[in-house]
């Protein structure tokens, strides 16, 4: 199988931009960002604070795991809303000191 999503271009741009911006804003100096696309989905991974964030609240509007300049607490809520609208799953997990956001088919 192939990970294939058909959606409005503006929604696709908003989804990917919000996840990428989140990875940049909440990274550490000298950190890294990895984007992986597989047949099962797309994953954004980044270095950052060295502990997991609050999975229960991370996709809520105005939630901020860390106070960073340039962050409104809306990006992940928007990404979550777009995923739900498009019948996609988005989940957060912390693995090998990386913050991971994975989008997959429902």
Regions found by a protein language model. Give the residues of each.
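Conserved micro-motifs of the catalytic ATP-binding
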Residues: 4-7
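A residue-level detector for a conserved hydrophobic packing site
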Residues: 12-16
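Short helix-loop "hinge" at the ATP-lid/N-box region of the Bergerat-fold HATPase_c
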Residues: 22-24
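Short beta-strand/loop element within the Bergerat-fold HATPase_c
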Residues: 30-41
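Short conserved segment of the HATPase_c
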Residues: 50-62
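Short alpha-helical Gxxx[C/S/T] motif in the catalytic ATP-binding
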Residues: 75, 79
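Conserved glycine-rich
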Residues: 88-92
């Amino acid at each position: 199988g192939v990970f294939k999503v058909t959606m409005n271009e503006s929604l696709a741009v908003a989804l990917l931009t919000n996840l990428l911006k989140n990875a940049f804003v909440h990274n550490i100096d000298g950190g890294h960002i990895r984007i992986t696309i597989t047949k099962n989905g797309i994953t954004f991974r980044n270095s950052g604070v060295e502990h997991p964030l609050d999975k229960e609240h991370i996709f809520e509007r105005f939630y901020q795991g860390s106070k960073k300049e340039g962050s409104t607490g809306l990006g992940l809520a928007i990404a979550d809303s777009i995923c739900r609208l498009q019948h996609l799953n988005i989940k957060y997990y912390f693995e090998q000191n990386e913050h991971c956001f994975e989008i997959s088919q429902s």
